[in-house]
């Protein structure tokens, strides 16, 4: 009994759209083709479309199968747990191995054959997704094992002082007599000198150079200046009565220990030994300016009653200021005339 659903083709046969042809009809098509019947005659005899007959016969000639479905079926899985295990072993032995080298080793060791060996892209994906995290975790664990233990930093309290390389280096620094020693808890750490530091540019010796110096004493550092008071400096002279001299002596005593290469304050001239500046001559702002001080500046209609032709506003001009240029010119002309005679 034929099914109730289906469609009828041009030849009068019944087929179901989207469903494969039954296996019995497929087998009959192959048998008629082996008897030498043409595909067009098979199509009319079995009432099956010509395209369906041609497709079934072509697939049978290529694969030898009359079953429906994709030719060859789905590809079997190649990334089995055994293959992944061997890939992980190869990667751990040689972290710099490439994917194509792993593929060759899988074939050489007999883990896979040429039909089920994974491709280079599949091996790269396995290394990235499944083995990459494990390799990074292993490197991190090995780094933590070989990492040295952290050294203790500066103690948080000067009462509970713990031994550290910084305090040991600070203990080797000699302390001159008369200067209190610096506690180890606040000692400055030793730093490597830099060629571009301020101390090298200015030519100031660093603390490390002072420690390596053979002399038993070293120049005072910044920490030692805080411990020095005014009692350590010599007092002023008793005969100093003037306040200015007393201040100058205090500055000389205070800055007497200047570093090498810098002049001391005592080498400069004191303010008391300098002569006062001369008082400038008072000149009226209404003075007439001319190209040269000469007698051609005659009287004017607006000349002052008590003034002179050279000073119409009754302002006195010193002779040395007014006629200095004229006198020099006159002396020069007399010397030229005498030499000509």
Swiss-Prot record:
Region of interest (RED subdomain), residue spans: 82-130
Pfam families: PAX
Annotated region described as Interaction with KDM5B, given as residue ranges: 168-189
Keywords from the named record: Developmental protein, DNA-binding, Nucleus, Paired box, Transcription, Transcription regulation
Nucleus as UniProt keyword: yes
Known partners and oligomeric status: Interacts with KDM5B.
Renumbered residue ranges of the record's region PAI subdomain: 7-63
One Gene Ontology term of the molecular function aspect: RNA polymerase II cis-regulatory region sequence-specific DNA binding
PANTHER family (UniProt xref): PAIRED BOX PROTEIN PAX-6-RELATED-RELATED, PAIRED BOX PROTEIN PAX-9
CDD domains: PAX
Organism: Propithecus coquereli
Record has Acetylation as a keyword: no
Gene3D superfamilies with a match to the protein in the record: Winged helix-like DNA-binding domain superfamily/Winged helix DNA-binding domain (1.10.10.10)
Name used for this protein in its record: Paired box protein Pax-9
């Amino acid at each position: 009994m034929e099914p109730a659903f289906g469609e009828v083709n041009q030849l009068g046969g019944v087929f179901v759209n989207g469903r494969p042809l039954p296996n019995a009809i497929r087998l009959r098509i192959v048998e008629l083709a082996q008897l030498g019947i043409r595909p067009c005659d098979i199509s009319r005899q079995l009432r099956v479309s010509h395209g369906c007959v041609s497709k079934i016969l072509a697939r049978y000639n290529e694969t030898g199968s009359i079953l429906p479905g994709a030719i060859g079926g789905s590809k079997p899985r190649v990334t089995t747990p055994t293959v992944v295990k061997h890939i992980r072993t190869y990667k751990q032995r040689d972290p710099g191995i490439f994917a194509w080298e792993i593929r060759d080793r899988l074939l050489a060791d007999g883990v896979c054959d040429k039909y089920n060996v994974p491709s280079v892209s599949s091996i790269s994906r396995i290394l990235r997704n499944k083995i990459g995290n494990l390799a990074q975790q292993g490197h991190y664990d090995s780094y933590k094992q070989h990492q040295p233990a952290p050294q203790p930093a500066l103690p948080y309290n000067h009462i509970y002082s713990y031994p550290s390389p910084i305090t040991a280096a600070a203990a080797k620094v000699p302390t001159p007599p008369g200067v209190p020693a610096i506690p180890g808890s606040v000692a400055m750490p030793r730093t490597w000198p830099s060629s571009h530091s301020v101390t090298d540019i200015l030519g100031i010796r660093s603390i490390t150079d002072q420690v390596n110096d053979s002399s038993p004493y070293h120049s005072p550092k910044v920490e030692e200046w805080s411990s020095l008071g005014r009692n350590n400096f010599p007092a002023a002279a008793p005969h100093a009565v003037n306040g200015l001299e007393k201040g100058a002596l205090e500055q000389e005593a205070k800055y007497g220990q200047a570093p090498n290469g810098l002049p001391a304050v005592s080498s400069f001239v004191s303010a008391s030994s300098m002569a006062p500046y001369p008082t400038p001559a008072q000149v009226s702002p209404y003075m007439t300016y001319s190209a040269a001080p000469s007698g051609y500046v005659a009287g004017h209609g607006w000349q002052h009653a008590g003034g002179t032709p050279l000073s119409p506003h009754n302002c006195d001009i010193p002779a040395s200021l007014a006629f200095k240029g004229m006198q020099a010119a006159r002396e020069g002309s007399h010397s030229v005339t005498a030499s000509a005679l």
